[in-house]
Amino acid sequence: MQEFMNFEECSKQNTNNCKQHEKNIDENNCSCKEKKVQSKKVSSDHSSSEDNASSDINSNKAETLTLNCGDQSDNKNSISDIESNKFIPNENDFQMLKKQLNDLKAENVNLKRDLQEAHQQRTNDNLKYLADFDNFKKRITVQTNREIKYALTDFIKNILIPLEQFEKVLEMPKVDDSVKSFLLGFKMIHKQVKDILQKEGVEEIKALGVKFDPNFHYALEKISDLKQPNGINVLVLQKGFLYKDLVIKPAMVKVNEWSDKNND
């Protein structure tokens, strides 16, 4: 298209040049005629010279017209070549472009689906990690609270051993009055220690005369007394203790069990 416009401009310019050149030739011819009228007495040689000049001018005009026509012919040939090489799509080209477009659309759909799946997977992973972390915090909290709650467990277990021995000494028969006065002081100390342990959450497990419970009692001996209820602790061999809600030492008991004989 640009070359076609250039061709039109070139044609217009050549036409203008031709008109201007013809005008110049006409002016020269008029000038020559005036000179011939005014100088009729000029010699034949001078007249011959003017004729030669006029011939040269006509010859130049013919050459200029020939060149301009040649340029116009070349421009027309160039436009024809451009039009002959112009791309004209056919049905196969349209089908190929349509197939490429459909392929791109399908690829776009697949990419969107993959992106959504990746986003959903990442969301699920984040939720799983958050849930795991929340459970971990809960376990740590429970464990920490338990450790704080039962921080004195080992200490209480250790102090109960000499305390039981201390009680056995206090239960011995009193023979001498001087010993009785010492025992009275020991009883006061024993009571103070028990009060301190009780404030810390230590209490004695009830065992005598109650039904045997494997969670709190440990049977060292068994008897079969039909006069007493079945499954009852008839004797406490060693005291048991609770620290808050934790059994730090089960009660050692003798259990009355006669159900087997009774069934016989």
Curated annotation (Swiss-Prot):
Cellular component terms per the entry's GO annotation: cytoplasm
Pfam family name, one: GrpE
Chain residue ranges for the region called Disordered: 36-59
Record's compositionally biased regions (Basic and acidic residues): 36-49
UniProt xrefs under Gene3D superfamilies: 3.90.20.20, Head domain of nucleotide exchange factor GrpE
InterPro entries on file: GrpE, GrpE_coiled_coil, GrpE_head
GO molecular function: adenyl-nucleotide exchange factor activity; protein homodimerization activity; protein-folding chaperone binding; unfolded protein binding
Primary location: cytoplasm
Gene Ontology biological-process entries: protein folding
Alphabetical UniProt keywords: Chaperone, Cytoplasm, Stress response
Location relative to the cell: Cytoplasm
Keyword Chaperone applies: yes
Low complexity compositional bias, start-end: 50-59
Function, in words: Participates actively in the response to hyperosmotic and heat shock by preventing the aggregation of stress-denatured proteins, in association with DnaK and GrpE. It is the nucleotide exchange factor for DnaK and may function as a thermosensor. Unfolded proteins bind initially to DnaJ; upon interaction with the DnaJ-bound protein, DnaK hydrolyzes its bound ATP, resulting in the formation of a stable complex. GrpE releases ADP from DnaK; ATP binding to DnaK triggers the release of the substrate protein, thus completing the reaction cycle.
Subunit relationships: Homodimer.
Family: Belongs to the GrpE family.
Name of the protein this chain belongs to: Protein GrpE
Organism: Peanut witches'-broom phytoplasma
The gene coding this protein: grpE
